[in-house]
Amino acid sequence: DGMETVKARQDYFKSLGGAMKALSGVAKNYDAEAAKAEAAKLEAILATDIKPLFAPGTSDADFPGESEAKASIWENMEDFGAKGQAMHEAGMELIAAANTGEASAFGPALKKLGGTCKACHDDYRAEH
């Protein structure tokens, strides 16, 4: 069912957003153990295969007011996939930075991950 897919996708991105918020909190008042713990949560989220969450027929055109995924995702799947891959790679870099215990590596890696979120949202997330 398309609406179930929309809800599952939203739940996934809410969990990712929650992780970003927690990681940002760690960056503001750096604590190596907290960074490692939050990075482990991020790693679990990033292990999810999100391809099924972007099934055709689940865009904002299909579910107005519910879905925030622009129909252009399915028209530009190669670019969308590349943006998703960039997010995943930046996330893994952040996890590696957190595991070093070095605050100096953590902040830039978090900023890079946030940039990948914005890049995709700017092109493919509908405003409601």
UniProtKB/Swiss-Prot annotation:
Domain of life of the source: Bacteria
An example Gene Ontology biological process: electron transport chain
GO molecular function: electron transfer activity; heme binding; iron ion binding
Pfam family, one: Cytochrom_C_2
Binding residues annotated for heme c, in chain numbering: 9, 14, 67-68, 117, 120-121
Record bears the keyword Phosphoprotein: no
Entry-linked InterPro entries: Cyt_c/b562 (IPR010980), Cyt_c_II (IPR002321), Cyt_c_prime (IPR012127), Cyt_c_prime_subgr (IPR015984)
Protein's name in the database: Cytochrome c'
Organism per entry: Rhodopseudomonas sp
